[in-house]
Amino acid sequence: MKNLLICIIKMYRKYISSLKRPSCRFYPTCSQYSIEAIEKYGALKGTLISIKRILKCHPFNEGGYDPVK
């Protein structure tokens, strides 16, 4: 399951995200953060952590450096 989620994120980065201008307010980007979270915490907890991060990525949040903890 973990590898499937990471593959989906990589496909998103290659085929969808590459067509848009960069818009993530954080470093690492939300997709890279998601991969790192899934690798570190597993499919379920990593996905939940990723969703929390993605919900913070909007114009009213300053963004900045936010590594997987």
Curated annotation (Swiss-Prot):
Keywords, ordered alphabetically: Cell membrane, Membrane
A cellular component term, taken from the record's GO annotations: plasma membrane
Domain of life: Bacteria
Protein's UniProt keywords contain Membrane: yes
Cleavable signal peptide: none
Cell compartment(s), UniProt: Cell membrane
Major localisation: membrane
InterPro entries xrefs: Membr_insert_effic_factor_YidD
UniProt membrane topology term: Peripheral membrane protein
Family: Belongs to the UPF0161 family.
Main function: Could be involved in insertion of integral membrane proteins into the membrane.
PANTHER family reported for this sequence: MEMBRANE PROTEIN INSERTION EFFICIENCY FACTOR-RELATED
HAMAP family: UPF0161_YidD
Protein name, per record: Putative membrane protein insertion efficiency factor
Species name: Clostridium botulinum (strain 657 / Type Ba4)
Lineage, broadest ranks: Bacteria, Bacillati, Bacillota, Clostridia, Eubacteriales
